[in-house]
Amino acid sequence: MKFLKNKQLGKIAMVATVSLSMLFSGTALIPSNTAYAYSSSKAQNVIQTAKKYLGTPYKYGAPSGSSRYFDCSSFTQYVFKKYGINLPRQSDEQAKVGKYVSKSNLKPGDLVFFYSPIHHVGIYIGNGKMINTYGKGGVRISDINSGTWKKNYKTARRVL
């Protein structure tokens, strides 16, 4: 009986030790390449890459892989692909990927979607702002809590 108690205590101690070491080392149980394991460092890299294209012209139906010009979904597809995340080509299809996120729980790097049916996507960068592209001016930073974006916000997805 004493042996069983010691064996059970040993298992509990081992689990507690592993859990504490994971907590303090920053190691997650979910692999970092899983679409649902949010990574703030990867999100910052995605945002920095997206910002490199500020001012890049908008062109509806821009081809995948081009960085000369973008439409909204080719932009998000292009930026995320640089970090190993393959998004579908169209915004309505991108809205089906990853994990649903409420507007109040947005984190930098989340995809934000607009209109019904969905036909616009941007990358949330924090503080109520997104980087996206449309019309004259091309890639830009917009406030999701004002004007047309506030009125037409639909959903968000986390793919990082």
Residue ranges and their predicted role:
Residues 16-29:
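Hydrophobic core
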Residues 2-8, 26-41, 45-49, 85, ...:
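Aromatic- and glycine-rich peptidoglycan recognition patches
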Residues 34-43, 55-108:
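Catalytic cysteine-centered active-site loop
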Residues 10-15:
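Sec-dependent signal peptide recognition
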